[in-house]
């Protein structure tokens, strides 16, 4: 049902003329609140406070918002309605994964957390790319990227079972780091896709290092591996973008 509602919302946003931006905001809110409601139905969920499950709102809402903006800017014509199908189905899978991972002892916890991490990085790429467009004010872009990065970091930190003030402080730190990277990239002639890809690489590097710090297993060789992967990925992205 949630996937169907998201599909209807995305089709309305992408198909109606004149353009109605509020439809995307509404669809993102439905995805987030729907996931929140699904999580609260889990037998292991006992915290009945109003904002207790707010953590589960961020990823599905940002996934819908990012996919809608990306499709709107990247595609034209009849390909738009077809492109709305995969993200709509993905929201159903995200909601299912969020529900199952409420229980840290779930049999498929590791695989589902991996799927949620992939969804988080893809959502980050879609939103970063849209916020890197030349017509978007650089200060607004940096602020929005900080917010997006912080919210997605909170989702990723669930793997370390970190909640509360500690998680919020780490999310703010990661968000500020990626926002600073966005400001640095302003001085380079990058298109939005290349800029978005570089920001995702930075986001992956920051969140990966945070994971290892929280697990108390960050060593020099691990940090070096992340650095090599980040440099190699950035080089591959730049070369590919120049050749295409």
Predicted regions and their residues:
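Cytoplasm-facing juxtamembrane segments at the starts of transmembrane helices
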Residues: 1, 47-60, 101-124, 138-144, ...
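Alpha-helical transmembrane segments in multi-pass membrane proteins
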Residues: 28-32, 59, 63, 120, ...
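C-terminal transmembrane helix-loop-helix hairpin of multi-pass membrane proteins
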Residues: 1-20, 166-244
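Perimembrane helix-loop junctions in membrane proteins
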Residues: 43-47, 136, 190, 212-215
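Hydrophobic, membrane-facing alpha-helical anchors
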Residues: 27-44, 84-102, 116-128, 139-157, ...
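N-terminal topogenic module of multi-pass integral membrane proteins
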Residues: 1-106, 219-224, 231-244
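Hydrophobic, membrane-inserted alpha-helices
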Residues: 4-11, 62-68, 120-129, 149-153, ...
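Membrane-helix interface and helix-disruption motif detector
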Residues: 12-27, 70-85, 129-143, 162-166, ...
């Amino acid at each position: 049902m949630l996937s169907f509602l998201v599909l209807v919302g995305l089709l309305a946003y992408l198909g109606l003329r004149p353009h109605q931006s509020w439809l995307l905001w509404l669809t993102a809110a439905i995805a987030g609140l729907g996931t929140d409601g699904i999580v609260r139905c889990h037998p292991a969920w006992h915290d009945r406070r109003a904002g207790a499950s707010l953590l589960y709102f961020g990823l599905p809402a940002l996934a819908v918002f990012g996919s809608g903006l990306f499709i709107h800017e990247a595609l034209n014509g009849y390909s738009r309605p077809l492109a709305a199908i995969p993200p709509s189905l993905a929201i159903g899978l995200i909601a299912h994964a969020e529900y199952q991972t409420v229980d840290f002892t779930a049999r498929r916890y590791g695989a589902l957390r991996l799927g949620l991490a992939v969804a988080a990085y893809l959502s980050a790429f879609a939103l970063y790319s849209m916020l890197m467009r030349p017509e978007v004010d650089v200060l607004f872009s940096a602020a929005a990227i900080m917010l997006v990065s912080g919210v997605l970091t909170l989702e990723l930190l669930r793997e370390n079972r970190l909640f509360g003030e500690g998680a919020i402080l780490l999310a703010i730190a990661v968000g500020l780091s990626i926002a600073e990277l966005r400001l640095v990239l302003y001085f380079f002639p990058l298109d939005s896709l290349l800029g978005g890809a570089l920001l995702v690489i930075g986001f992956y590097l920051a969140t990966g290092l945070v994971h290892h710090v929280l697990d108390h297993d960050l060593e020099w060789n691990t940090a070096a591996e992340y650095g090599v992967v980040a440099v190699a990925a950035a080089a591959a992205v730049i070369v590919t973008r120049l050749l295409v």
